[in-house]
Structure formats: C-alpha cells, structure tokens
From Swiss-Prot:
One of its GO terms (biological process) is tRNA splicing, via endonucleolytic cleavage and ligation. It comes from Hahella chejuensis (strain KCTC 2396). Keywords: NAD, Transferase. Gene3D superfamilies: 3.20.170.30, RNA 2'-phosphotransferase, Tpt1/KptA family, N-terminal domain. This is Probable RNA 2'-phosphotransferase. InterPro entries: Ptrans_KptA/Tpt1, RNA_2'-PTrans_C, RNA_2'-PTrans_KptA, RNA_2'-PTrans_N. Its EC number is 2.7.1.-. Removes the 2'-phosphate from RNA via an intermediate in which the phosphate is ADP-ribosylated by NAD followed by a presumed transesterification to release the RNA and generate ADP-ribose 1''-2''-cyclic phosphate (APPR>P). May function as an ADP-ribosylase. The gene is kptA. Pfam families: PTS_2-RNA. Belongs to the KptA/TPT1 family. One of its GO terms (molecular function) is NAD+ poly-ADP-ribosyltransferase activity.
C-alpha cells in the first residue's frame, strides 16, 4: 500500500474503530457506517479520500482491517474497536494454542497481570508464531507469548474469530500464558 493510501487507511481506522464523532459519523450497533456519509464527513474535515480510495484500501489491506457490506454501501472495521459495537461474533472453539506478540519492555507486566484489552474491547491473538512476531515487531524488540487456549476455554473464557482471522477473547490471566523461546538453536 502506498504512503497516501496508508495514511487514509489510518484515518479509516480512527473513525471506524475509535472516534466516529470526529467527522459526525453515525455507526449502527454493529459498527457499520454509510460510505457516502463517511466521505462527506471526511471532506468537511479537510480529509481527501474518495470512494475509489476506500474500495482500494479494503481490497488491498493485507490485514483485512475493514469489511464492506454486500451492497458495498457500508463499511466497518473488522475488529480493534475502543467504542462499544456488536460485531455479531459467535463463540468458536480455538486451536489448543494461540500466540500474542508484544515488545520485550512489556514482558514483566504481562507475566504478572496477563493480557488485558486496554482501550480495545478484546485481547488480540494470532493463530501462528509468524503473525505474532510481526505484531510484536511493530512495538519494539518482539517477544512471543504462547496462550493455552484449550485451558482458557475449559475455564469458561469465550473466543471469537474476527472476519480478518484475528482471535479475540476478553482477557488472558497470567497462568494461561508462557514465554515462547524464539532464540536461534545451535
């Protein structure tokens, strides 16, 4: 994604996940927004984004952060909201292990208190080590945590799989996670 589209994608994340009021954008209970209303609100705030930009961002975003309605007239963020929306997620059984990437500077706090959603609605988890490593690398030197999703499920925690294949749960207490050794062998 080129630099201009990346900036526009960040704008979409901001208004669809966190601050729709910045452009007076009404979201329905499930997080959907009318694209024409979004474009008009963006223009009022001096943000130059077109329908073609929106369609290209949705089509080319490797993380599939956004979804379009069947008629392509509405858009929503797939997950990562700090505002209260119902993404209509159904609990699903996760794989036995999931992973979470973070920066090494957060290791002690995570081991002490577990994973909390912070400003988001859910903790975000990855199905594979590679994805978790990429996530952790965005925040500094990465560290990977292995999550005992099977034990968490047996303890009554619900898991959801977002439209863009990110695993979501309410929290991960410290007894259900461990540091994954990613040092080179040999």
């Amino acid at each position: 994604m080129d630099k201009k589209l990346k900036s526009k994608s960040k704008f979409l994340s901001l208004v669809l996940r966190h601050q729709p009021e910045l452009i007076q954008l009404p979201l329905d209970a499930n997080g959907w927004a009318d694209i024409e209303v979004l474009l008009a609100g963006a223009a009022r705030q001096g943000v130059n984004i077109s329908l073609q930009d929106v369609l290209e961002i949705v089509a080319t975003n490797d993380k599939q952060r956004f979804a379009l309605s069947g008629d392509k007239r509405r858009i929503r963020a797939s997950q990562g909201h700090s505002i209260d929306v119902d993404l209509q997620l159904t609990p699903v059984t996760p794989p036995d292990e999931l992973y979470h990437g973070s920066a090494t500077r957060f290791t002690d706090a995570i081991l002490a208190t577990g994973l909390q959603p912070g400003q988001r609605r859910h903790v975000h988890l990855s199905a594979d080590v590679e994805t978790a490593h990429k996530v952790g690398s965005r925040h500094g030197k990465p560290v990977i945590f292995r999550i005992d999703a099977k034990a968490l499920t047996l303890a009554g925690h619900a898991f959801y799989l977002s439209a863009n294949q990110v695993w979501l749960t309410d929290a991960v207490p410290p007894q259900y996670l461990s540091l994954l050794d990613t040092s080179p062998q040999g």
